[in-house]
Amino acid sequence: MSTAGLLLAAGAGRRYGMPKALAQAPGGAELLVQRALRTLREGGCDPVVVVLGAGAEQAPPLPGAQVVVNEDWPTGMGSSLRAGLDALPEEVTAVVVLLVDTPGVTPQAVRRIAADARATTLRVATYSGDGGHPVLLGRDHWDGASRLAVGDVGARPYLVSQLVEEVPCDDIAIGTDLDTPPDLRDSDA
């Protein structure tokens, strides 16, 4: 039994002006895709699948990750979620899904979401009571999440149709996503 990480990093970042995966993370020492990969690895996820799309050819090497290029990335996050879930090995019991534009999510939040995960587990991190990332999908939920994942809403249609365990993460992470360069500049991550 293992818990994998799934990093969704395929979007063009239209509001951001470039693929967010290739943007500098707060602090400037690494790109957002590298920060998020490190967060999943340090959070105990193994293996980690990174789904790239827009700008994939410009991405740096991502040691410790299986990179999947989603050629359908213009259709939205749903196709990236499906591509990532399809790439996971059979022995994986659950997967922690993280978005590349949430650099305030910490390895501690990943560990909290992933604790004692089973194939039946379905969890979402909350910040001030609102759902965010990471999200944990036990293997029993992959088919349903894949079927309902359309456009840029990812697994949300599936999550709202299920009983989801909410896991408060306010004390160890910042769940805000970055949509524009000023968001990054103003980030506390």
What is each residue range found by the language model?
Residues 1, 147-189:
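Conserved alpha/beta core of the MobA/IspD/sugar-nucleotide pyrophosphorylase nucleotidyltransferase superfamily
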Residues 2-131, 139, 163-169:
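Nucleotide and nucleotide-moiety/phosphate-recognizing core
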Residues 15-18, 144-145, 175:
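A short acidic, helix-capping loop that chelates divalent metal ions and anchors anionic groups
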Residues 86, 141, 145-146, 153:
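Hydrophobic, well-ordered secondary-structure segments
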Residues 102, 133-136, 147, 175-176:
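A residue-level structural signature of the nucleotidyltransferase/glycosyltransferase Rossmann-like core
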Residues 132-144, 181:
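Conserved nucleotide-sugar donor-binding
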